[in-house]
C-alpha cells in the first residue's frame, strides 16, 4: 500500500511546539493549500489541512517557519479517534509530516521589498537571451548512414 502526501501551501499560523512527557518535540499547524480550479465565482478556494511534525523537524519548523510562510511538506495521511468530554467519538484526519522545505527566500519571508542594501545597477545590462536553448534535432538519427542488412541476416 502507498500512503504518500506532498503538499505546498502557506502556514495559517505559527506552529505550536509542545513536548511529550518523554521530551519528544511535536509541532502542529495548519497549511492552506490552493485548489487547482476556481469556483463558479472565479475565485480560487483553499483547503486547510492539519499537519503534525515530530522530533528535530518539529523544532526546526517552529524556529524557521512562521505564519504566512510558503512551505512544502512530505509525509503521510493518518486517521485517529478519541472520546471528547461529552463522551462523543471524534475522528481526526491529519498529515504526519516527515520533512518540510522553505520555498521562499528569507527576504520574501520577512517582507523586505526594499532594504538597506541595493544592488548596483549602473553599467549592468541583462543578457539578451537568458533562457537556455533546449531545442533538439528533430531527427536524432538523421546524421547517420543507413545500415546495409539483408533479410538473411535477421534472426526472425
Curated annotation (Swiss-Prot):
GO cellular component: a single term: nucleoid
Keyword Signal: no
Domain SSB intervals: 1-104
Record flagged with keyword Ligase: no
UniProt cross-references to InterPro entries, sorted A to Z: NA-bd_OB-fold, Primosome_PriB/ssb, ssDNA-bd
Keyword list, A-Z: DNA damage, DNA recombination, DNA repair, DNA replication, DNA-binding
Region Disordered: start-end pairs: 111-156
Record motif Important for interaction with partner proteins, residues: 151-156
Gene Ontology biological process terms from the UniProt entry: DNA recombination; DNA repair; DNA replication
A Pfam cross-reference name: SSB
PROSITE patterns (alphabetical): SSB
Biased composition range(s): Polar residues: 120-132
Source domain of life: Bacteria
GO molecular function: enzyme activator activity; single-stranded DNA binding
Known partners and oligomeric status: Homotetramer.
Function comment: Plays an important role in DNA replication, recombination and repair. Binds to ssDNA and to an array of partner proteins to recruit them to their sites of action during DNA metabolism.
Name under which the protein is recorded: Single-stranded DNA-binding protein
Lineage of the species this protein comes from: Bacteria, Bacillati, Bacillota, Bacilli, Lactobacillales
